[in-house]
C-alpha cells in the first residue's frame, strides 16, 4: 500500500499543529482519541488573549513589523468576535482549541501572517497558561458565590436571635446551644474555603508562557511582559516546571472538593431537620420538589444533590491525582486528562451554589420545636457537673454524681429538672436545691460565655467578626479582579491603537 500524498490527509493540515516529519496523516482512530475540542473549546477566549500578548512580544523582539503587529491584533479581534458569535466553531478536523483557532486566524489574516504567530511558543506552555487563566477567573466566580452563601447563613443567624436548639455529638443530645451559634459554625469552614481560594491564587499567579515545549525559547521574547499582559504577577521560574506542573490544578480541585464536603455536611443536617421526626425547618416551595406518585411529598432535593455532588467533586480530585502520580518530567500527553475533571468541578459548583444559597436564604426554622427538644436527653447534665466543680467538688466525683443523677431521672422517666429535692439528696449531699439554677436551657446557654462559646454575647461578637472577615476577603478578591481586568483592558486596547 502506498501512502497518500493528498494534503488533506496529512498531519500538517489546517487544524493540526504538527506533521512535517510524517509521511501521512494519523489514523481515524488516533484522530478520534486525540481530539479534545469537545472540552477545551471553552478555553478559546483565553487562547486568543494569550495570542494577543504573544503577538506583542514577537513585535517587541523584532519578529513582527509594526504593521504586522497591528494587522495581527486586528485579526485576533475579528477571530474573537467570530468565536463569541458562534460563526467559528471547532470542526472534526481540529485536534484541539489551539489548532482550531489557528485555522480561524489564517482564514482572516492569511497563512503568511497567521503562520508567524506560532513562533516561540508551544502548546505545552500555552495550555499550562490558559488553564491557569480559566481557573483564576472561575475561582473569582466561585469566591463571589461562596460569599453570598456565607451572607445568607449569617443573615439567618442574625434572625435567629436567642433561639435555642439541641446541640449534638454522635447525633445524640449533648448540650443546648443557640441556633445562631450552630449556623455560624457552618460559616467558618466556608470562610476558610474563601481563604484557600485566595491562598491558591497567590500560587496560581505565575505564567508558564515562554517555557516553550520544556527548555524555553531562543527568540528572546519577554515572558515577563506576556505575564503582565495576561494578569499574572510574574513568569515561571523554571521552564520544565512551567510546562509540566499541574499541582496548581490539583490544589484547585481540592479546594472545590472541600467546598463540596462543607456543603454536604450542612445538607445532611437540613435533610434530617426537614423530617417529621425533627421538624426543625420548612423548605420554601421554590427550593424543593415533589413526588410523581405521592402527592404529599416535599423533598429536599437541593440538599440531596449537594450531598451527592460532593462525591463527584471528590472523584474528580481523585482521578486527577491518579493521573499525575507517575508522570516523569516534562510534558506528557496524560496531562490532557487534567482539564475535564476540574472543568466538571467548576461547572458543578457554579450550578449548585446559587440554588443552595437560595435554599438557605428561604429556610424557615421552627424555633419552638427546637426549644422543646433542647433539654431532652439530659442535655443539662454537664451544667450540673460544672456547678458541682464550682462548689469545690472534684470533677471526677462531680462526673460520677451527675451520672447517678441521670440514672435516677431516667429510671423515673423524668427530666433532671423534674427531680424533687429529696431525689437530689438521695443521690448526693452535694446536690442541694440551689443546683436548680443551672437546670434551664436559657441559663445553660448564657453561662457559656468563654471565648467562642454559645452565650448570646459571644455569638453576637462572633457574627460581627465573621462579617468583618468576609468583607476583608471580598475586598481582596475585588482588588485582584480589578488588577486582572485592568491588565486585560490594557492589553486588548492596543489592538485598536
Curated annotation (Swiss-Prot):
Organism: Clavibacter michiganensis subsp. michiganensis (strain NCPPB 382)
Recorded superkingdom: Bacteria
EC top class, as a word: lyase
GO CC terms in record: cytosol
Its EC number(s): 4.3.2.1
Cellular compartments annotated: Cytoplasm
PANTHER family found in the cross-reference section: ARGININOSUCCINATE LYASE
Protein name (database record): Argininosuccinate lyase
InterPro entries, per the entry: Arg_succ_lyase_C, Argininosuccinate_lyase, Fumarase/histidase_N, Fumarate_lyase_CS, Fumarate_lyase_fam, Fumarate_lyase_N, L-Aspartase-like
This protein's UniProt keywords: Amino-acid biosynthesis, Arginine biosynthesis, Cytoplasm, Lyase
